[in-house]
């Protein structure tokens, strides 16, 4: 971890520059997007708490941190549709592996949206998914460089130079797994030199909790380069970072599955939201945010 700015401080600094409603995933990192709740019980006698919760029209969604901004836009549109005006949506954003662990340890949610299939499969194997997951979006990888390019990284080969400060995530986090897979493909190109992927990984100075923290590290100039999703760059103010494209032959397509969970307290609203995300309107919002359509 770089000593100049721990992840929590870096995240705070970034959030002070851009308005969005997400917090990095911890058991308490829930942010709510609320309207006027019009739901009421038809009973005149008090109901048990568990039954009231079962009849709730409030949605709790666990979603990959790379979806933060686009899902915020989704909520704004979805909640204006008939039947959704009083819906309250609470989103817990973080690395998909962190969210998967929280769910396996008993956290309750209506929907899980992961940045890779692996985490969703593990949640399904734990018996937590209601029905089948569907792929609703795709993404691709880019190399991100801070303003001023202090490491003088101009080509993919430069990532392997001694002394380059490279930032990533652990391999169990989707972006970390995708980045390592892409580096392995790049290692087959003679132009990148022998042992390319091992040299780049040896340059890692910090393994962050999720992709948004990778972007923060690079944006603040605390790393010379990192690999993130192409969509993450759209959230950074113009001029603060530049990118190096990874060719299709070495890129990795990130697939995002979404599913309703058996712990859902608002399954009908969850189904409506997933239907909206997969609809032409929802897909157009994803495309506008630089995601690839399902």
Functional labels for PLM-detected ranges:
Residues 108-111:
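Short, structured active-site "lid" loops
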Residues 1-15, 19-32:
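N-terminal secretory signal peptides
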Residues 2, 11, 33-105, 116-117, ...:
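Exported/periplasmic ABC-transporter solute-binding proteins
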Residues 142:
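N-terminal glycine-rich flavin-associated loop
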